[in-house]
């Protein structure tokens, strides 16, 4: 079946398969978002090299344009003309589609404009929380509100903010901190954030600091949160920035190799150089489970072979995007896998804790859902093919496709088109490794 037809049908069928070969993980979605907006904050032209071009990152590029910049695709790169320290007042509503990162980061950028900006998104995004960011921007001198009064989009933002100090929780989304740091660098006085609760997904703020540094912007962690000086200029060396590979996306390929590599063969994933990404922890998780895996950090190549896996306990406070992958690994491993610190994973594109519990149960796994945990008892039952729903969540779709490689019979996943959010050619790459995904 042609790939276009497969995706147009909004479902994918995966049958038991053995995989082998080399693949390249897509560029990092997190880095691409930040690089596009950082280039927007810059004056003049910046080339963002090797970006991820997906539904989510296209939403950020469109937002940069509506704020007065330009973003053109040239030879696989994104050439961005910045709007500088003062975005324009958009002449249309900014539609962030399904991208929470776009909405959070651009909401703070919009608060720099001398006027009103309206942001919205699809049904899933309109159900996600933004209240702490709205309160923070209002506390910094702007006006930011939810039209429904519940902290959810549509959002209306009035600026400009000039900077200051603000308190906000750290356990809802680290993207609030990222948004304030990126915008704060071009305010008059800078922005200091004091976190009132423990920061979840802290490595994503590390990614932000990494990108800011590459663009010549200084920001730092404090005893209570983070601080960025005002009056800074975004100016990357050589007016360009190269995006690293994405460990979140690579996790599905690595899991496929650990569970379904052919005898005597391996799955080799290229483009995986060390970076600030917390999801590089997937390598450690696989090692702890007993996988035969090797990471050559100098060449950026990870090699994994099939082996017997054992259950482990893994906290995902800093790596929420890995929960679906780890849950699938646990379902195919011996013993119990306990995924902890997972309450915030319920507030992604969907409630990933509940969704994975439901889907893995349909496939025959023994799963227990708790408020802050997902417990998967591997080895209790054999996985069997079934029809499961990706719930409009790209990470669920890809994780369940990996489960389909080792389930008995066909696994049909609804909503397969949503891989376009972060890994548009996922099914083509999986087929290139030998997976039977043509139904």
From Swiss-Prot:
The lineage of its organism: Archaea, Methanobacteriati, Methanobacteriota, Stenosarchaea group, Halobacteria. GO terms for biological process: amino acid biosynthetic process; aromatic amino acid family biosynthetic process; chorismate biosynthetic process. Gene3D superfamilies: Enolpyruvate transferase domain. Its main location: cytoplasm. Catalyzes the transfer of the enolpyruvyl moiety of phosphoenolpyruvate (PEP) to the 5-hydroxyl of shikimate-3-phosphate (S3P) to produce enolpyruvyl shikimate-3-phosphate and inorganic phosphate. The active site is at residue 321. Signal peptide: none annotated. It catalyses: 3-phosphoshikimate + phosphoenolpyruvate = 5-O-(1-carboxyvinyl)-3-phosphoshikimate + phosphate. This is 3-phosphoshikimate 1-carboxyvinyltransferase. It comes from Halobacterium salinarum (strain ATCC 700922 / JCM 11081 / NRC-1).
């Amino acid at each position: 079946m042609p790939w276009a037809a497969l995706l147009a049908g909004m479902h994918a069928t995966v049958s038991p398969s053995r995989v082998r070969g080399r693949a390249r993980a897509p560029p990092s979605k997190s880095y691409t978002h930040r690089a596009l907006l950082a280039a927007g904050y810059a004056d003049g032209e910046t080339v963002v090299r090797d970006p991820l071009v997906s539904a989510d990152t296209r939403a950020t590029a469109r937002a940069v344009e509506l704020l007065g910049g330009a973003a053109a695709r040239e030879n696989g790169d994104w050439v961005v003309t910045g709007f500088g320290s003062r975005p324009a007042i958009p002449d249309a509503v900014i539609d962030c589609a399904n991208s929470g990162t776009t909405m959070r980061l651009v909401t703070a950028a919009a608060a720099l404009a001398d006027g009103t900006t309206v942001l919205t998104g699809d049904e899933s995004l309109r159900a996600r929380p933004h209240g702490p960011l709205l309160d923070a921007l209002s506390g910094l001198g702007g006006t930011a509100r939810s039209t429904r009064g519940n902290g959810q989009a549509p959002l209306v933002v009035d600026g400009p903010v000039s900077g200051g100090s603000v308190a906000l929780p750290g356990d809802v989304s680290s993207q609030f901190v990222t948004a304030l740091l990126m915008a704060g660098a071009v305010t008059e006085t800078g922005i200091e954030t004091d976190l009132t609760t423990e920061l979840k997904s802290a490595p994503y703020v590390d990614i932000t600091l990494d990108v800011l540094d590459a663009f010549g912007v200084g920001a730092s962690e404090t005893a209570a949160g983070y601080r960025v000086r005002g009056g800074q200029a975004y100016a990357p060396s050589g007016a360009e920035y190269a995006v690293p590979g994405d460990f979140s996306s690579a996790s599905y390929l690595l899991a496929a190799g650990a569970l379904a590599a052919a005898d005597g063969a391996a799955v080799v994933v290229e483009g995986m150089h060390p970076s600030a990404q917390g999801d590089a922890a997937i390598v450690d998780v696989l090692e702890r489970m007993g996988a035969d895996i090797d990471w050559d950090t100098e060449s950026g190549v990870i090699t994994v072979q099939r082996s017997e896996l054992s259950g482990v306990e893994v906290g995902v406070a800093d790596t929420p995007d890995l929960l679906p992958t780890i849950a699938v690994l646990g379902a195919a491993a011996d013993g119990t896998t306990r995924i902890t610190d997972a309450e915030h994973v319920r507030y992604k594109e969907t409630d990933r804790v509940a969704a994975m519990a439901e889907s893995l149960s349909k496939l025959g796994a023994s799963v227990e859902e708790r408020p802050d945990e997902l417990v998967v008892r591997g080895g209790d039952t054999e996985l069997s093919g079934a029809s499961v729903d990706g719930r409009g969540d790209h990470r669920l779709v890809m994780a369940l496709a990996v489960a389909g490689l080792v389930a008995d019979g066909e696994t049909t996943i609804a909503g397969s088109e949503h891989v376009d959010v972060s890994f548009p050619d996922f099914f083509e790459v999986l087929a290139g490794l030998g997976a039977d995904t043509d139904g």
